[in-house]
């Protein structure tokens, strides 16, 4: 009986899956390349300030760009996938405080019919900046 109790966590771990993001299509990759052209990636950060008048740009159901200025754009790979975002659904982010942080719950919804279409969480933010002259 003890052997079964010891093996139960291993059996449950074997059932868990890993998340593989959907690769970008050629059109999505071109959109991201155009937005990040001339910018250099930096080290990942877990939180960024919410800036007024800035928006997330949806690249795919699991990739977002957060434009702070022409000189600074953050790339975010979602944890999970909000598939509806790629179709143009509305993104809803639940934040706690004045920052967007890794793990903040994000969902997508089709507001024309009032149905949620996906749930995911924000991942790490990778800053892309203009290189120093």
Model feature map: region roles:
Residues 5-9:
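Sec-dependent signal peptide hydrophobic core
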Residues 1-3:
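Positively charged n-region of N-terminal signal peptides that target proteins for export
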Residues 12-14:
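C-terminal motif of bacterial Sec signal peptides marking the signal peptidase cleavage site
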Residues 79-133:
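Helix-rich interaction surfaces within compact, conserved domain-sized segments
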Residues 16-75, 133:
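N-terminal secretory signal peptides
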